[in-house]
């Protein structure tokens, strides 16, 4: 290797180290063993091109991170939705840990900028490839778990993932009306009634407001582009209120 290329490699290395420092500052996560952090972002193509150096790719960390992510998301959903059936919990978890969701999170955190790639993978757009980014997110979770345990993983997810669940980002896979019905029937509280209380907007862009009541008492209000969507959002609000009341008792 010429002195010039050795200097270039060294410069690249220090630049990458600086990037990882900035990244840790930005997400308020500081690794005790930074080798694990670097490994989480090391693609197999990079290792193949640097065989003389002791680099490890992120595939084993990805395997571990997948399991850790499923566990932490499962724990959160189990506690948050006491009335939700096993089938619905499974569907919701699948929507949260599916590739498009993980890719969206990886983009939000600029994971693609940090990935160590081989030249061939780089030239074919690997840095933006969805499967690669989803794998890196899982590998990062695996690395964080190995470095610090389950609690810091949950703290990280509390900032970047759980609020999205709370804000209804995955509500398209949830049937809140059925959940509310089951919750009310289980406690023998009576029957629910849905009513469209308001409609507005032109015919091609209508917005509906729905109210769900129990024994004439309004429980939740929701809006949507269709009557069904508005009713689902009303049921979601009602369910959240009932569950909050239940946990206080």
Curated annotation (Swiss-Prot):
Reactions this protein catalyses: Endonucleolytic cleavage to 5'-phosphomonoester
Keywords annotated in UniProt: Cytoplasm, Endonuclease, Hydrolase, Magnesium, Metal-binding, mRNA processing, Nuclease, RNA-binding, rRNA processing, tRNA processing
GO molecular function: double-stranded RNA binding; metal ion binding; ribonuclease III activity
PROSITE patterns: DS_RBD, RNASE_3_1, RNASE_3_2
Gene null: resulting phenotype: Essential. Depletion leads to the accumulation of 30S precursor rRNA, and alteration of levels of about 11% of total transcripts. Increased half-life of type I toxin-antitoxin system RNAs of BsrG/SR4 and toxin BsrE mRNA (note these strains must have an essential second-site suppressor to survive).
Cell location: Cytoplasm
Organism superkingdom: Bacteria
Subunit organization: Homodimer.
Entry-linked HAMAP family: RNase_III
Name of this protein: Ribonuclease 3
Gene name in the database record: rnc
């Amino acid at each position: 290797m010429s002195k010039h290329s050795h200097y270039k490699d060294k410069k690249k290395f220090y630049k990458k180290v600086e990037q990882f420092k900035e990244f840790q500052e930005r997400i308020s996560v500081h690794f005790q063993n930074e080798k694990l952090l670097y490994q989480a972002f090391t693609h197999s193509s990079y290792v193949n091109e640097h065989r003389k150096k002791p680099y490890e790719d992120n595939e084993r960390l990805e395997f571990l991170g997948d399991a850790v992510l499923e566990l932490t998301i499962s724990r959160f959903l189990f506690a948050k939705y006491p009335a939700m059936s096993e089938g619905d919990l499974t569907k919701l978890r699948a929507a949260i840990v599916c590739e498009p969701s993980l890719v969206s999170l990886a983009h939000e955190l600029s994971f693609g900028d940090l990935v160590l790639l081989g030249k061939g993978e780089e030239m074919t757009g690997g840095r933006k490839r969805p499967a690669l980014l989803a794998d890196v997110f899982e590998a990062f979770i695996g690395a964080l778990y190995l470095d610090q345990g389950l609690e810091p993983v949950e703290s990280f997810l509390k900032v970047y993932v759980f609020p999205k669940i709370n804000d209804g980002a995955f509500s398209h896979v949830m049937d809140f009306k059925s959940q509310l019905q089951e919750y009310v029937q289980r406690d023998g509280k009576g029957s629910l009634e849905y009513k469209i209380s308001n409609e507005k907007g032109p015919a091609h862009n209508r917005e509906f407001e729905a109210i769900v009541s129990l024994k004439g008492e309004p429980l939740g209000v929701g809006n949507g582009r269709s009557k069904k969507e508005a009713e689902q959002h009303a049921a979601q609000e009602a369910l959240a209120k009932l569950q909050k009341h239940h946990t206080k008792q």
